[in-house]
Amino acid sequence: EELYSLTKAMVATGPRLKFPGIVADKHSAGGVAGTRTTMIVVPIIAAAGYTIPKTSTRAITSPAGTAYTMEVVATVTFTTTQITRIVEKVGGCIVWGGHVGLAPADDILIQVERPLAFESYDKIIVSVMAKKIASGANHLVLDLPVGPTMKIQHFKDAELMSRKFMMLGKRFKMKIVVDINETRQNAGRGIGPVLEARDVFEVLEQAPERPLALEAKALRLSGKLLSLCFADTPGKKDLDGEETARELLLSGKALAKMREIIRAQGGHPDVLSNKLTP
């Protein structure tokens, strides 16, 4: 009840985004640098025809959050009105949540956490749920990496967090699928915004030298989220989420969608992985 009340109160401290129908989202508890799956998952989900307004942090406990990495190729600071316009036009976005002001009480707490490089488990749960509710999400995939150097170091803790996420999901009418995975190293090759962006585009371009571990994780998360969305989409209940995600990646549709998102966010849509150098 305390988690529910705190989440509800944090959502009420700022504006909310609203979109019709299925609104997908993804979050990773993080703790490992160089694993920038969001920038692969978002264009895959949007290419599948689902709305995915992704708001991300710049960084809390790693060198480069998703917002920093996306900022290499596009603007990430927008108002709620601008975000709504972008998402209505191209189906998705990858923007900095701190500028939007969704659940702003959380951003104040993040300023405390950053110098400590620490987040409590319950704070992670409340923070994630408040942001997702404020962004209008109703279908969510959660990535909970577990390992000796992760924010979550024991599987029993991840399982407890998963149960709490599911409980809050029911209270707020949000469908959630949780991916608990053992993580001992980064899935990509680069550390830092430019190199992590290069990893992302190597996967989207299907470059021969792309980081396969990053691709595999992004496809797994995309697949779980698509399956969750398909279950509530007439005529798509029997489709395989991960197989669909792979088809969208291999066909180039995910890359094309990413270029649409970059263009809509004022960036250079013709960016290539081999041009991304520090």
Where are these regions (language model features)?
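Active-site cofactor/substrate anionic-group-binding motifs, chiefly glycine-
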Residues: 2-60
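Self-splicing inteins and homing endonuclease
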Residues: 9-28, 86-111
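Well-ordered secondary-structure scaffolds
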Residues: 17, 119, 138-278
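Structural motif
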Residues: 22-24, 43, 50-53, 84, ...
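Short glycine/serine/threonine-rich phosphate/pyrophosphate-binding segments
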Residues: 32-42, 46-47, 54-55, 62-66, ...
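Alpha-helix C-terminal capping segments
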Residues: 39-53, 72, 131-136, 171-172, ...
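A glycine-rich helix N-cap at a beta->alpha junction
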Residues: 69-93, 163-169, 173
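Phosphate/diphosphate-binding glycine-rich loops and adjacent basic-rich segments that engage nucleotide
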Residues: 90-139
